[in-house]
């Protein structure tokens, strides 16, 4: 098996070469030879042992928070061959190239999978050992520019957090002292016992079958007037049975709401597990960008059909609220009338564009899969036809997408 013999460090027209054996020796016992000395000496002396340890320590031993799946060679292979994995590797491969200055995408993938399968584990030094070309070429100019941009972004984030903290502390000082022990317990506000009803929805037009759960007050006749309806849309790789979401649904139902929770079968936990088990080629279907808001629409259509027979016509289906997190946040936005700026997305997803912290954002990589859709599907995403006029309220703590929706949100008047 071939391994990388040399590490090429390129910075514009300038370059240096470090023998891989020099890095091996340093990782093994701290030996610093003449070729490696200029680089090791640039690291503060007190940090050099940490650098040595990181080079030779498998990923799973560096942090106790690393899931086992991250270092499983089969699961890694499945993910790295998926559309999102390919996209990630293509971007990294521009920074870490082959000896012949080709994109290192395939070589990096091979090194990761082989290192993960090696008893020595997924460590930087083992990646070098399993890199399948004679040399690894690092584009330092791009790597340093990316690191600088990331550092700037972190500084801006820290500044925003600091400013928000100062404002919060100032408001707390100005506000009267609140004795929380005197406040009522939220659970005491619950007015109704809650029951759960399971549905199986079959949308023949889309050839799509998916389950949904309803949470509602046990005694609907005890509610006066129209019964408000909320729909909760789960996130990417999640499920309608998420305990936290179910708890929120039950809390709403205990206070007079009928809450519906659909299972988005093309982007749920089961679909993601199928990828890891080798039963699927992708972690979610690109058509989910269309199907998710249509799941909401068909669910509302189903509730309208059942309203007169099961709910005495009292469900307030002309003023529905939506709640969504992550991919569910996108679902809420689309069902409320927000559209996608395709031209901007194409620029952000361009693999030949300069690499920035923004275009290696995982959320953007998810969104880039939208460009796989056919023309008619993309048309639905850009013309607002996925909107449902029955939606009157949206709440999305966090949507999964990188795209700036400030322009798109002007397409909807939903608060």
What annotation goes with each model-predicted range?
Residues 366-415:
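The feature captures the conserved acid-bearing segment of alpha/beta-hydrolase catalytic domains
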Residues 169-226:
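N-terminal cap/lid segment of alpha/beta-hydrolase-fold proteins
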Residues 301-304, 329-343:
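Short glycine-enriched nucleophile-adjacent loop
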Residues 224-235:
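Short beta-strand element of the alpha/beta-hydrolase
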Residues 15, 27-178:
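Mature extracellular/secreted ectodomains of secretory-pathway proteins
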Residues 237-246, 251, 263-291:
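Cap/lid segment of the alpha/beta-hydrolase catalytic domain
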Residues 322-324:
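Short beta-strand immediately N-terminal to the catalytic nucleophile in serine-hydrolase-like folds
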Residues 281-317, 344-365:
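Alpha/beta-hydrolase active-site loop
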């Amino acid at each position: 098996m071939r391994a990388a013999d040399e590490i090429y460090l390129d910075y514009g027209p300038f370059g240096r070469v470090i023998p891989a054996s020099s890095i091996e020796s340093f990782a093994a016992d701290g030996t610093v030879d003449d070729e490696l000395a200029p680089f090791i000496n640039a690291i503060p002396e007190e940090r050099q042992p940490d650098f040595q340890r990181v080079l030779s320590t498998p990923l799973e031993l560096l942090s106790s928070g690393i899931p086992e799946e991250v270092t499983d060679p089969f699961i890694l292979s499945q993910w790295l061959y998926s559309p999102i994995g390919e996209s990630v590797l293509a971007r990294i491969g521009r920074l870490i190239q082959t000896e012949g200055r080709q994109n290192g995408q395939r070589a990096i993938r091979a090194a990761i999978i082989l290192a993960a399968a090696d008893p020595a584990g997924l460590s930087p030094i083992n990646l070098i050992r399993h890199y399948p070309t004679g040399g690894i070429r690092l584009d330092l100019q791009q790597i340093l520019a990316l690191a600088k941009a990331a550092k700037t972004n972190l500084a801006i984030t820290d500044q925003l957090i600091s400013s928000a903290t100062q404002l919060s502390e100032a408001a707390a000082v100005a506000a009267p002292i609140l004795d929380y022990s005197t406040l009522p317990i939220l659970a005491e506000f619950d007015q109704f016992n809650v029951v759960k009803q399971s549905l199986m929805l079959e949308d023949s037009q889309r050839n799509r079958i998916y389950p949904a759960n309803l949470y509602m007050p046990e005694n609907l006749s005890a509610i006066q007037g129209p019964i408000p309806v909320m729909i909760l849309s789960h996130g990417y790789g999640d499920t309608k049975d998420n305990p936290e979401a179910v708890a929120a649904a039950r809390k709403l139902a205990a206070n007079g709401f009928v809450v519906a929770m659909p299972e988005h079968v093309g982007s749920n936990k089961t679909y993601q597990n199928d990828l890891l088990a080798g039963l699927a080629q992708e972690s979610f279907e690109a058509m989910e960008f269309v199907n998710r808001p249509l799941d909401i629409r068909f669910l509302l259509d189903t509730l309208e059909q059942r309203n007169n027979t099961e709910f005495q016509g009292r469900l307030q289906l002309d003023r529905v609220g939506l709640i969504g997190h992550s991919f569910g946040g996108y679902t809420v936005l689309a069902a409320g009338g927000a559209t996608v700026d395709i031209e901007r997305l194409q620029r952000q997803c361009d693999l030949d564009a300069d690499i920035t912290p923004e275009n290696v954002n995982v959320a953007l990589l998810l969104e880039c899969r939208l460009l796989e859709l056919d023309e008619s599907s993309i048309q639905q995403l850009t013309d607002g036809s996925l909107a449902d006029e029955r939606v009157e309220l949206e709440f999305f703590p966090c949507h999964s997408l990188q795209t700036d929706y400030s322009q798109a949100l002007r397409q909807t008047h939903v608060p």
